[in-house]
């Protein structure tokens, strides 16, 4: 084998080893994003909910800052219950549809049904809750105690 081929092979192997240490992204995040867009009829981009208040986004602590943030806390709690059932909510894929009346779930397994219900409830809650720009990207160390 040529030395250049060995270097390429070595580089591929090293990159694969490094990639195996990277945690996977939540698989149902895209589905949740579409449920949100369906529920709010596209009135606000889904990423606006990724860093809102004390609970929308990664983690969560303290008292929710408003109704929308309470939706995220309820969603977090729902995922916690799903985990107690032995489900992996961030990795669970499910079937859903966006109909004229909004999104709805159409899934087969208990975990799929439960996780889809969590996401559906949150998406509908987001759609009916006011969005306060002042609660986007807040200093959680000060406001979420």
Swiss-Prot record:
Enzyme class, top EC level, equals hydrolase
This entry's Gene Ontology molecular function terms read: calcium ion binding; calcium-dependent phospholipase A2 activity; phospholipid binding
GO CC, one annotated term: extracellular region
Q: Where does the record place the catalytic residues?
A: 75, 119
What tissues has this protein been observed in? Expressed by the venom gland.
* Swiss-Prot/TrEMBL GO biological process terms: arachidonate secretion; lipid catabolic process; phospholipid metabolic process
The cofactor(s) it depends on are: Ca(2+)
Q: Does the keyword Flavoprotein apply?
A: no
Which residues of the precursor form the propeptide?
Answer: 22-27
Where it mainly occurs, coarsely classed, is secreted
State the reactions this protein catalyses. Answer: a 1,2-diacyl-sn-glycero-3-phosphocholine + H2O = a 1-acyl-sn-glycero-3-phosphocholine + a fatty acid + H(+)
Localization in the cell: Secreted
EC number assigned by the record: 3.1.1.4
Q: Where is the signal peptide?
A: 1-21
Q: Which PROSITE patterns match?
A: PA2_ASP (PS00119), PA2_HIS (PS00118)
- Provide the alphabetized UniProt keywords: Calcium, Disulfide bond, Hydrolase, Lipid degradation, Lipid metabolism, Metal-binding, Secreted, Signal
| Sequence similarity | Belongs to the phospholipase A2 family. Group I subfamily. D49 sub-subfamily.
Record's PANTHER family?
PHOSPHOLIPASE A2 A2-ACTITOXIN-UCS2A-LIKE, PHOSPHOLIPASE A2 FAMILY MEMBER
Role noted for this protein:
PLA2 catalyzes the calcium-dependent hydrolysis of the 2-acyl groups in 3-sn-phosphoglycerides.
The protein's name: Basic phospholipase A2 GL1-1
Source species of the chain: Laticauda semifasciata (Black-banded sea krait)
């Amino acid at each position: 084998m040529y030395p250049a081929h060995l270097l390429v092979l070595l580089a591929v192997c090293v990159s694969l080893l490094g990639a195996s240490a990277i945690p996977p992204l939540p698989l149902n995040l895209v589905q949740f994003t579409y449920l949100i867009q369906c529920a709010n009829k596209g009135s606000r981009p889904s990423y606006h909910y990724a860093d809102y208040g004390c609970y929308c986004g990664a983690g969560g602590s303290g008292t929710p800052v408003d109704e929308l943030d309470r939706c995220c806390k309820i969603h977090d709690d729902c995922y916690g219950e799903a985990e107690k059932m032995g489900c992996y909510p961030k990795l669970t894929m499910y079937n859903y549809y966006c109909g004229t009346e909004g999104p709805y779930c159409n899934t087969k397994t208990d975990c799929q049904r439960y996780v889809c219900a969590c996401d559906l409830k949150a998406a509908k809650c987001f759609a009916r809750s006011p969005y306060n720009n002042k609660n986007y990207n807040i200093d959680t160390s000060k406001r979420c105690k």
